[in-house]
Swiss-Prot record:
Matching Pfam families: RecA, RecA_C
Annotated source species: Rickettsia africae (strain ESF-5)
Cited function: Can catalyze the hydrolysis of ATP in the presence of single-stranded DNA, the ATP-dependent uptake of single-stranded DNA by duplex DNA, and the ATP-dependent hybridization of homologous single-stranded DNAs. It interacts with LexA causing its activation and leading to its autocatalytic cleavage.
Domain of life of the source: Bacteria
GO process annotations (BP): DNA recombination; DNA repair; SOS response
Alphabetized Gene3D superfamilies for the sequence: P-loop containing nucleotide triphosphate hydrolases (3.40.50.300)
InterPro entries named in the record: AAA+_ATPase (IPR003593), DNA_recomb/repair_RecA (IPR013765), DNA_recomb/repair_RecA_CS (IPR020584), P-loop_NTPase (IPR027417), RecA-like_C (IPR049261), RecA-like_N (IPR049428), RecA_ATP-bd (IPR020588), RecA_C_sf (IPR023400)
GO cellular component: cytosol
Annotated keywords: ATP-binding, Cytoplasm, DNA damage, DNA recombination, DNA repair, DNA-binding, Nucleotide-binding, SOS response
Binding site for ATP: 66-73
Name of the molecule in the record: Protein RecA
Amino acid sequence: MSNTDKERAIAAALAQIEKSYGKGSVMKLGQRPHVDIEAVSTGSLGLDIALGIGGVPKGRIIEIFGPESSGKTTLTLHLIAEAQKKGGTCAFIDAEHALDPAYAKKLGVNIDELIISQPDTGEQALEIADTLIRSSGIDMIIIDSVAALVPKSEIEGEMGDAQMASQARLMSQALRKLTASINRTNCIAVFINQIRMKIGVMFGSPETTTGGNALKFYASVRIDIRRIGSIKDKEEVIGSQTKVKVVKNKVSPPFKTADFDIMYGSGISKEGEIIDLGVKLDIVEKSGSWFSYKNVRIGQGRENVKQYLKEHPQISNEIEKIIREKSSKITNINLDQTEEEND
């Protein structure tokens, strides 16, 4: 077959497919209208840089997992706040029935515009999510959490009844159904997940996430979030030192990590990140306990500098802008290349 005949055959096949399934159902990759991946900020400057595209990608599935009280819900509430700032509509599927509206409001979430559902079963939760995503009106949907998506058969059964992998089957079926709708509507679907321990593991990490393996494969980005220490004011604990690791990333190189502070009552401390990244990039000078910007001392001690940046937002925004401009030069934000994941 000559090249001309091949081109005609392909053109005829494409025309037939478009006639059957609609315009845009098949095309050459270069003809796609949106080639660049859009992103929504996570609310953490360091994590935005670690993700490589300035935030979480639109039209993809995201998994955020970690131990209890590690900051999973706090991070997702910051995601909602950032999406709403861009004019996006967000939905929260609260399967754990534990969302605190007052805390969400403190983190910048417009609770009057946030759609919330507290379903009774896993099937109901995922059907609601599917309907909202298919509407094309939702920009971000949060499912909190995968562990709380209890199958109807388990709820209606007796305590102690064996339910072999029913949750894993439910998740596998739901993700097969959801993934095309998520991509087509450019919606961000964020699944919060918990950690469990595998029994009898002799080598490697015994930790695993709930809901089977389907979410690991369908997720474009997987974020591991951990509490690594406390922030104290004298004897009182006022926050948590937090480390996040991007263990899977289909839109940028994975395995990058970032550290930030989560302050109780106010969420991720942007000022703390600006100081740390500013020092790392030589934008902010540190001499002993003193910090300087443009040869002007801005405070002694990290907490005092954080307060200074809160009181002088124009300087904070200026440093943040320079950090984002220089972020392409950061090849290692506490990057750990010794660990690998073959998802």
